[in-house]
């Protein structure tokens, strides 16, 4: 298989069962064959963590303490071989086949080459549980968010239940099969994303720092930067087998969507 010029950076913490399920999905749908640079950063690493990574012949960064997401992202980025980074966490299961995955990642590279800043890859139809933005279904333009200090900073996430390019064409448009907008309407998220290493290190981390409160620190600043964001049908479903083991996650999220109608 053709290799993509992408470093796949996976952050994991204290959840071997979920990581094992996630890596099985990456192997099943060929993601592990699409890059020659795949590394897992383990926080509070255990012997089981290390053995699991060795089973898949993955490079590892082993930490005995929990250093927080900001510092962990920085270490992963600094150690990435390629300028393009696909950032994942241990609970993002790949649900699309090999051809779709490869094609969607190639399109993502095209967006980065067209000067887009972030390409997001959470599955549109099967996002997994929880989907926090669902609380804004029906009032997408009518809520104020304290973190971001503005209205509707999560508007792009409405793509999970409607077509935002049709509903909000002055704010979100389509480019091919991808929705495109700016960071004013697409909050920063640690959900799966493709980004340039230089953008992550020089712009994001230089502002947000290495704090455990990374997402909150960046929120208000992010909405004012006019960064270019793209998101298509997506590839990954949130599936944390430790936190949410009892229910089928897709069934649970669909049920919640129906309850909001």
Q: Where are the regions that the model predicts?
A:
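Cell-envelope/extracellular polymer assembly enzymes that use nucleotide-activated donors
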Residues: 4-7, 37
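Short, well-formed alpha-helical segments that are part of the catalytic scaffolds
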Residues: 15-30
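Short aromatic/hydrophobic "clamp" motif used to bind/position activated sugar donors
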Residues: 85
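Short beta-strand-to-loop element that shapes/binds the nucleotide-sugar donor at the catalytic cleft/hinge
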Residues: 117-137
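C-terminal catalytic/acceptor-binding lobe
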Residues: 162, 167-261
């Amino acid at each position: 298989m053709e290799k993509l010029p992408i470093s796949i950076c996976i952050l994991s913490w204290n959840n071997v069962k979920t990581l094992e399920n996630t890596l099985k999905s990456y192997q099943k749908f060929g993601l592990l064959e699409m890059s020659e640079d795949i590394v897992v950063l383990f926080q509070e690493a255990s012997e089981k963590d290390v053995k699991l990574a060795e089973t898949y012949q993955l490079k590892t960064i082993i930490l005995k303490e929990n250093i927080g997401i900001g510092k962990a992202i920085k270490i992963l980025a600094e150690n990435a071989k390629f300028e393009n980074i696909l950032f994942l966490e241990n609970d993002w299961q790949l649900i699309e086949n090999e051809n779709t995955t490869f094609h969607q990642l190639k399109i993502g590279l095209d967006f980065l080459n067209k000067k887009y800043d972030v390409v997001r890859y959470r599955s549109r139809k099967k996002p997994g549980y929880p989907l926090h933005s669902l609380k804004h279904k029906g009032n997408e333009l009518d809520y104020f968010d304290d973190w971001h200090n503005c209205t509707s900073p999560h508007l792009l996430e409405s793509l999970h239940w409607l077509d935002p390019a049709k509903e909000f064409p002055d704010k979100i448009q389509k480019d091919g099969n991808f929705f495109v907008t700016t960071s004013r309407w697409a909050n920063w998220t640690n959900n799966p994303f493709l980004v340039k290493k230089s953008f992550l290190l020089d712009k994001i981390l230089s502002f947000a720092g290495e704090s455990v409160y990374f997402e909150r620190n960046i929120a208000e600043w992010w909405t004012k930067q006019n960064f270019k964001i793209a998101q298509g049908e997506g590839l990954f479903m949130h599936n944390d087998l430790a936190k949410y083991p009892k229910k089928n996650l897709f069934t649970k999220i669909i049920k919640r969507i129906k309850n909001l109608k």
